[in-house]
Amino acid sequence: MRIEICQSYEALSLKAKEIVTSELGQHKALTLCAATGGSPTRMYELLVEEASRQPELFSQFTVLKLDEWGGIPMDHPGTCESYLRNYFVGPLQIPEDRYIAFQSDPENPEAECERIQQILDQKGPIDICILGIGMNGHIALNEPAPSLHTDRKSVV
């Protein structure tokens, strides 16, 4: 692991964009796991700008939505789905066959997790994951706790 220390949010966003574009340059068909929230927003904007200059770089990669709030409609503006479609998937015009997304209101949340796991089992591992750390230390929907849970889970 390499730790990068950046002096500002803009510098962090630029560095993250450089890492993602470098990885895409080496492996265009990679799977990128995308988080939502304040941390990655500027990086997504920079990637969209880069895609206007180098569209071929973004022509094969797959986006996996990291997580989703349960029990609300997918078109609700507060979903991770809405965020990713507004800031990343939509502006990059990622086709549905290269966008893997949890449903926000499945009848069976465990079956939905299994559906995503089966897709990943077929496709292969995640190549790069974009994560931020929330103000209280949370990562994704994993709130601070005495231990980490390594298996997939549904949070309601």
Per-region residue spans from a language model:
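Generic structural signal for well-ordered alpha-helical scaffold segments
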Residues: K17-G25, V48, S52, R85-V89, ...
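Glycine-rich N-terminal segment of FAD-binding domains in flavoprotein oxidoreductases
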Residues: Q26-S52
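Short glycine-rich anion-binding loops that position phosphate/pyrophosphate groups of nucleotides
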Residues: G38-S39, W69, M135-H138, P144
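Short Gly/Thr/Asp-enriched flexible loops that form oxyanion-binding sites at enzyme active sites
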Residues: M43-E49, I139-T150
